[in-house]
């Protein structure tokens, strides 16, 4: 076996093994997405997180899993069977994915102000219509998750929620906000949250906790909710995690470039004379 044949054989099995790994990874991601769709309650208990945007995550995970499995399958079969058509299709899919990522990066950099305005409009619309439209459940769950994770409330400030009609309290009642705004560390009275949620849970029955955005908490004092708006919270999160985000994007891009280079190299250097059909006889 010549040095060139040894190199091609090494590249072939390298592509096969790594794409097999990504195929298994895609299968697991797809299974998690299906799990969420079938049994949301057990998934929430498993991950141990509150205010998880289940509807969005189930679709994202399922689609991502199918896409990952599809690309990995092309790489596995194309490399193992030395099929130029599959290797070329594998290269094209990776190139399209890489170009899409570059385009998104450029758009985010050049249209940042417009994206911020669009995001603000979407969030303000979600806040104003909170709890009034069953079709907006996914958006409400997502915003609850953002508030819970970033420890913030509202877009500009917590008072954004006080303008929502169904949450507004009268002179004798405390204001109400989504429970994702509630700051448990601000008070030692851990029963306040339960006093508000439990009556709702009793009415929901077996559907209790299936939609966390339905949880509304009374706030006896503004000190019991996060004081920072999520606009500032998002800016802080991006600033603190900028290096990690850039590192992950660069890592994914380099990985895609590496697989593209290996696949096109293998595709161009396969023996033109060898009859691929002979091995199937």
From Swiss-Prot:
<dbReference type="GO" id="GO:0002639">
    <property type="term" value="P:positive regulation of immunoglobulin production"/>
</dbReference>
<dbReference type="GO" id="GO:0016020">
    <property type="term" value="C:membrane"/>
</dbReference>
<feature type="topological domain" description="Cytoplasmic">
    <location>
        <begin position="1"/>
        <end position="17"/>
    </location>
</feature>
<dbReference type="GO" id="GO:0002920">
    <property type="term" value="P:regulation of humoral immune response"/>
</dbReference>
<feature type="topological domain" description="Extracellular">
    <location>
        <begin position="112"/>
        <end position="241"/>
    </location>
</feature>
<dbReference type="GO" id="GO:0070062">
    <property type="term" value="C:extracellular exosome"/>
</dbReference>
<feature type="glycosylation site" description="N-linked (GlcNAc...) asparagine">
    <location>
        <position position="170"/>
    </location>
</feature>
<feature type="topological domain" description="Cytoplasmic">
    <location>
        <begin position="75"/>
        <end position="85"/>
    </location>
</feature>
<feature type="transmembrane region" description="Helical">
    <location>
        <begin position="18"/>
        <end position="38"/>
    </location>
</feature>
<dbReference type="GO" id="GO:0001772">
    <property type="term" value="C:immunological synapse"/>
</dbReference>
<feature type="transmembrane region" description="Helical">
    <location>
        <begin position="60"/>
        <end position="74"/>
    </location>
</feature>
<feature type="topological domain" description="Cytoplasmic">
    <location>
        <begin position="267"/>
        <end position="281"/>
    </location>
</feature>
<dbReference type="InterPro" id="IPR000301">
    <property type="entry name" value="Tetraspanin_animals"/>
</dbReference>
<dbReference type="InterPro" id="IPR018499">
    <property type="entry name" value="Tetraspanin/Peripherin"/>
</dbReference>
<dbReference type="GO" id="GO:0042130">
    <property type="term" value="P:negative regulation of T cell proliferation"/>
</dbReference>
<dbReference type="Pfam" id="PF00335">
    <property type="entry name" value="Tetraspanin"/>
</dbReference>
<dbReference type="GO" id="GO:0005886">
    <property type="term" value="C:plasma membrane"/>
</dbReference>
<keyword id="KW-0812">Transmembrane</keyword>
<comment type="function">
    <text>Structural component of specialized membrane microdomains known as tetraspanin-enriched microdomains (TERMs), which act as platforms for receptor clustering and signaling. Participates thereby in diverse biological functions such as cell signal transduction, adhesion, migration and protein trafficking. Upon ligand binding, two signaling pathways are activated, one acting through phosphorylation by LYN leading to cell death or a survival pathway with activation of GSK3B.</text>
</comment>
<keyword id="KW-0325">Glycoprotein</keyword>
<feature type="transmembrane region" description="Helical">
    <location>
        <begin position="86"/>
        <end position="111"/>
    </location>
</feature>
<comment type="similarity">
    <text>Belongs to the tetraspanin (TM4SF) family.</text>
</comment>
<dbReference type="GO" id="GO:0042098">
    <property type="term" value="P:T cell proliferation"/>
</dbReference>
<protein>
    <recommendedName>
        <fullName>Leukocyte antigen CD37</fullName>
    </recommendedName>
</protein>
<dbReference type="InterPro" id="IPR018503">
    <property type="entry name" value="Tetraspanin_CS"/>
</dbReference>
<feature type="transmembrane region" description="Helical">
    <location>
        <begin position="242"/>
        <end position="266"/>
    </location>
</feature>
<keyword id="KW-1003">Cell membrane</keyword>
<dbReference type="GO" id="GO:0042832">
    <property type="term" value="P:defense response to protozoan"/>
</dbReference>
<comment type="subunit">
    <text>Interacts with SCIMP. Interacts with SOCS3. Interacts with DECTIN1/CLEC7A.</text>
</comment>
<keyword id="KW-1133">Transmembrane helix</keyword>
<keyword id="KW-0472">Membrane</keyword>
<dbReference type="GO" id="GO:0030886">
    <property type="term" value="P:negative regulation of myeloid dendritic cell activation"/>
</dbReference>
<dbReference type="GO" id="GO:0050688">
    <property type="term" value="P:regulation of defense response to virus"/>
</dbReference>
<dbReference type="InterPro" id="IPR008952">
    <property type="entry name" value="Tetraspanin_EC2_sf"/>
</dbReference>
<feature type="glycosylation site" description="N-linked (GlcNAc...) asparagine">
    <location>
        <position position="188"/>
    </location>
</feature>
<feature type="glycosylation site" description="N-linked (GlcNAc...) asparagine">
    <location>
        <position position="183"/>
    </location>
</feature>
<feature type="topological domain" description="Extracellular">
    <location>
        <begin position="39"/>
        <end position="59"/>
    </location>
</feature>
